[in-house]
Design a protein with these regions (language model features):
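Bacterial N-terminal signal peptides
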Residues: 1-2
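Beta-propeller folds
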Residues: 5-392
Length: 392
């Protein structure tokens, strides 16, 4: 111990302060991703695969090569610019590239006017998907399982460049609702098979427009939004399910949507039913409901949760990958956010975590060992540490 203490060198200001002669900048590794069990290290000019056991890096492709391949193609699904003989938008870097196919050497490249599926082993173009072209789509949601792409243009929803809705101003489809409360951050939800799309439809025509000042342009402009003031009428939300194959939409038969919140949408693993947590406007009564994805009819109310002050559902249910009859429900019923194991009949099997600390996030599963991986504040509310929880 004495020798080790003598060998330790105390850091100097030159070591610690940026600009010091001996200051060492720690390498930043942004946007690391997984392709199956292989770690992907994206860069500006190159894309590397990293062996997680050895750390060995293997070059997959380069930005120059990808751009050469893409700019040499004119395909039936290409953008208007490409069809007219102009070059596609160039890939500027690999940081927003995704790898949603663990069993295929494909990557998803997001360009301003098109999504590209690219084979990085063969350096070949696989598929191109315009994501709105000149219409400037937002809220883009791509399903690798079904190969469909959903997006919104202004207040309407499109799938594969076909209009799903044609609503007037005051009715918004495919976007986040309920002022982004209760864990809501998006408005479209693909089924696990990628053949059905659940989406929000929000009627806010009864809500009085509220003026906001946009100071972005040189001369400020008034931008009106519909904001439900306390004690006044709130917007009404419904949930639709669109089938790209038939191009038909079924809406859930939820009844009168007045003063009701429909939150935390999730799909059954087989895609035959849709789950959501309904909340009243007083926010003291929540219900977990299951709907038939073909008919939109209510199949069952699995459980209800009430509290004298409030309940605050923030997370959709999450099915166990090794047993589709069981799912994890998150609740603050004992004062802290914890995990509860339920079956699809609505029966509580057991509480998986407990204590005066929060489960912050479910990070994934270890299916072989029947474990769920979580981040929590168990050690300290100032820290976030990783834990594994045995489900069996």
């Amino acid at each position: 111990t004495e020798l080790m203490a003598q060998d330790l060198k105390k850091p100097t200001l030159e070591d610690l302060l940026s600009g010091g002669e001996t200051y060492r900048i720690i390498e930043n590794l942004p946007n690391l991703r997984w392709w199956g069990d292989v770690c992907i290290k994206p860069g500006i000019d190159s894309l590397f695969a990293v062996n997680p056991k050895t750390g060995k890096e293997t070059l997959l492709t380069t930005r120059e090569k990808v751009n050469q391949v893409l700019n040499s193609l004119i395909t039936p699904t290409a953008t208007t610019a490409a069809v007219s003989g102009q070059k596609r938008s160039k890939v500027q870097h690999f940081y927003n590239t995704e790898f949603p196919w663990p069993d295929k050497p494909y990557m998803l490249i997001k360009l301003p006017a098109e999504y590209i599926v690219y084979d990085f082993e063969k350096d070949e173009f696989v598929q191109g998907m315009p994501q709105a072209g000149e219409r400037k789509g937002s809220d883009i949601d791509y399903t690798p399982e079904g190969g469909h792409i959903a997006y919104t243009v202004k207040n309407n929803l499109f799938v594969d460049n076909k209009a799903v809705t044609k609503e007037p101003e005051g009715i918004v489809c495919g976007q986040s609702v309920h002022r982004n409360e209760f864990g809501i951050s998006k408005g479209t939800f693909w089924s696990p098979q990628g053949d059905l799309l659940a989406f929000y439809r929000m009627n806010e025509s009864m809500v009085t427009p509220y003026p906001l000042v946009d100071i972005t342009p040189r001369i400020a402009l008034v931008d009106k939004i519909r904001y439900p003031m306390a004690g006044m009428l709130s917007h009404q939300v419904s949930v639709g399910i669109y089938n790209p194959g038939t191009q038909k939409t079924v809406y859930l038969n939820t009844g009168d949507p007045t003063n009701r919140y429909f939150t935390n949408i999730s799909w059954a693993p087989d895609g035959k039913s849709l789950y959501l947590i309904e909340l009243n406007r007083e926010q003291n009564h929540a219900k977990l409901c299951r709907y038939d994805s073909k008919t939109g009819e209510l199949m069952s109310t699995l459980m209800e949760e009430t509290h004298t002050k409030y309940v605050e559902p923030q997370h959709p249910i999450l099915f166990l990958p090794w047993d589709h009859t069981l799912f994890i429900y998150q609740s603050q019923r004992d004062g802290y956010n914890h995990l509860y194991l339920y079956n699809t009949d609505g029966k509580l099997i057991r509480q998986l975590t407990r204590g005066e600390w929060l489960v912050q996030k479910i990070l994934g599963f270890n299916a072989k060992k029947r474990e769920v991986i979580i981040a929590s504040t168990e050690v300290s509310p100032l820290q976030s540490n990783l834990y594994k929880v045995n489900v069996n």
